[in-house]
Curated annotation (Swiss-Prot):
Residues 36-68 are annotated as: Disordered. It comes from Bordetella petrii (strain ATCC BAA-461 / DSM 12804 / CCUG 43448). It is found in: Cell inner membrane. Gene3D superfamilies: 2.70.98.90. Interacts with the Sec translocase complex via SecD. Specifically interacts with transmembrane segments of nascent integral membrane proteins during membrane integration. GO terms for molecular function: membrane insertase activity. This is Membrane protein insertase YidC. It comes from the Bacteria. Its main location: membrane. The chain crosses the membrane at residues 6-26, 373-393, 443-463, 482-502, 512-532.
């Protein structure tokens, strides 16, 4: 009865199942566990093609909530004639943004400090409006009376500001538009070294009657996975909604298309975001004001996440102002937490967040000391192994004793043959005599599993690993080892671990144990180098611990035999 090997066999079988499932998804076939969260094989939608031609991608603006219905406006001015469409490029030290004067919407964002994977001189493009990607930031006003319309993301705006490059600590990009008796001034304020943008909507009632507009803040994206998405490990691409009541809620694009997404519809706090591996875009509306959240499919493979809130009644000649914040950039947990409560949760460590967050904090602290994320991973692995050393020692002692009695165990199997009842009784008697716990090598491993899984997600999800070098040939811990040296080292360490363990008496189990390094090592060929580095260090330390403990037990046994 070897429960430890049974558990290892279960882990091995499940890993093969996951590997096959990812291969199915990679080849465009249905997932074994249901519909994939986002279809990377979807054909370009009509909305994407329209956007590439300079047209508005969304066929209509949001409807007005019932509470914000407007009254008749006898003196409202007609919408101005269409202005020339213009694209405005502005830049800071960390962002290069492109605005379209149609709707004063943000249609392209380049992250200057984050190169594209494999192209160090090309910045990552997070937002874009092209045949390959539709991902834009929009806002506007609804609730105009008598079939008129307030300025929205389809309305021609005029560029008012003149500066296109950050020279001081902040840069303002200002647009204006008049429609439906409402003059709207939209101001984007960018800051040095920051990815959060202050967005101000100033409303002036130029009509002869009160107006009651509602402001919508909208993110629009196609449902395709990012171009650099791996088929060998899953990362989330979709929408996230946060509120103090329901906390963090993730919704896949496929669930939005089916109308199945579960999220808070009415709230007076929180934010909404579109999330992908390492990066996010989020609207943070004014806190303390009631709003409606909407997630919808506006066209095939084109989705919108928006928040709509009533501005209140604006009297003739009066003005109103709504201040919001926009995040466009990496999933920097510290910076995001300073922008809005819970915004750092877009870095989703899953059900092991309670363990993962302290691990990330410790990893960040080690990086501040060592100045290198690769060495920080090595140091963190050493610390974790040291903390779990008592458990590991108990496990290795149990395995060493099992190895010592392996010949006797084989003799019992030959003696009792197919009589399983007598064999089990004899094995239990031998375990009692030798003071061996059959579960002794298994339970310590089980206790450590949640910590190692949490660390796996920390290394996979943390944007700090992206573009971070280690030594020599490893120039980016977030991509696979270009020369496959680390996966080869990992396979070698796994073979050594197997050699140190008792040989399974069952020939089939023995063959499976020898195949496991090839399977897991083969998977690691496609995993980020930071993860493989962690496994290599972990395995190396495990081998050193096991060899030391086994040698000590052998010496004690030899000393006892020589007395």
């Amino acid at each position: 009865m070897d429960i430890r090997r049974t558990i290892l066999w279960m882990i091995f079988s499940f890993s093969l199942l996951l590997l096959w499932n990812n291969w199915q998804i990679h080849n465009g076939k249905p997932s074994l566990f249901g519909t994939p969260p986002a279809s990377s094989a979807a054909s370009p939608a009509e909305g994407q093609q329209a956007a590439a031609n300079g047209q508005a991608a969304t066929p209509s603006v949001p409807t007005t909530p019932a509470a914000a219905a407007a009254s008749t406006v006898p003196g409202a001015t007609a919408a101005p004639a269409a202005a020339k469409v213009e694209q405005v490029v502005v830049s800071t030290d960390v962002l290069r943004l492109t605005f379209d004067t149609t709707g004063a919407q943000l249609i392209r964002a380049e992250l200057l400090k984050y190169p594209t994977s494999g192209q160090p001189n090309k910045p990552t493009v997070l937002l874009d409006r092209s045949p390959e990607l539709t991902y834009v930031v929009q806002s506007g006003l609804v609730g105009a009376p008598n079939g008129q319309s307030f300025p929205n993301h389809q309305t021609p705006f005029r560029l008012v500001s003149t500066d296109h490059e950050l020279k001081g600590d902040s840069l303002q990009v200002v647009f204006e538009a008049d429609s439906g008796g409402l003059k709207v001034t939209k101001t984007y304020t960018l800051h040095r070294g920051r990815y959060d943008i202050d967005v101000q909507h100033s409303l002036a009632n130029t009509s002869d009657a009160p107006l009651a507009p509602s402001l919508y803040l909208q993110l629009e994206r196609d449902g395709n996975d990012p171009a650099d998405t791996s088929s060998f490990y899953h990362t989330f691409t979709g929408v996230a909604v946060y509120s103090e009541q329901d906390k963090f809620q993730k919704i896949t694009f496929s669930d939005i298309a089916k109308g199945k997404g579960s999220y808070i519809k009415q709230a007076d706090n929180g934010w909404l975001a579109v999330v992908q591996h390492y990066f996010a875009t989020a609207w943070v509306p004014p806190q303390g004001k009631q709003r409606t959240n909407e997630l919808l499919q506006v066209q095939p493979n084109l989705y919108a996440a928006r928040s709509i809130e009533a501005v209140g009644t604006v009297q003739p000649g009066a003005t109103a102002q709504v201040d919001s914040r926009l995040w466009v950039g990496p999933q920097d947990q510290k910076a995001m937490a300073a922008v809005a409560p819970g915004l750092e949760l877009v870095v989703d460590y899953g059900w092991l967040t309670i363990i993962a967050k302290p691990l990330f904090s410790l990893l960040t602290w080690l990086h501040s000391l060592l100045g290198n994320w690769g060495w920080a991973i090595v140091a963190l692995t050493v610390i974790i192994k040291a903390v779990f050393f008592p458990l590991a020692a108990a496990s290795y002692r149990s395995m060493a004793r099992m190895k010592q009695v392996a010949p006797r165990l084989q003799a019992l199997k030959e003696k009792y043959g197919d009589d399983r009842q007598k064999l089990n009784q004899a094995m239990m008697e031998m375990y009692r005599t030798e003071k061996i716990n059959p579960l002794g090598g298994c339970l310590p491993m089980v206790v450590q599993i949640p910590v190692f899984i949490a660390l796996y997600w920390v290394l996979l999800a943390s944007v700090e690993m992206r573009g971070a070098p280690w030594i020599l040939w490893v120039h980016d811990l977030s991509v696979r080892d270009p020369y496959f040296i680390l996966p080869a080292v990992m396979m070698a360490t796994m073979f050594l671990q197997i050699k140190l363990n008792p040989t399974p008496p069952d020939p089939i189990q023995a063959k499976v144990m020898m195949i496991m390094p090839l399977v897991f090592g083969g998977m690691m060929f496609f995993f980020p180098a930071g993860l493989v580095l962690y496994w290599c260090v972990n395995n190396t330390l495990s081998i050193a611990q096991q060899w030391t403990i086994t040698r000590n037990l052998q010496r004690k046994a030899e000393a006892a035999a020589n007395r």
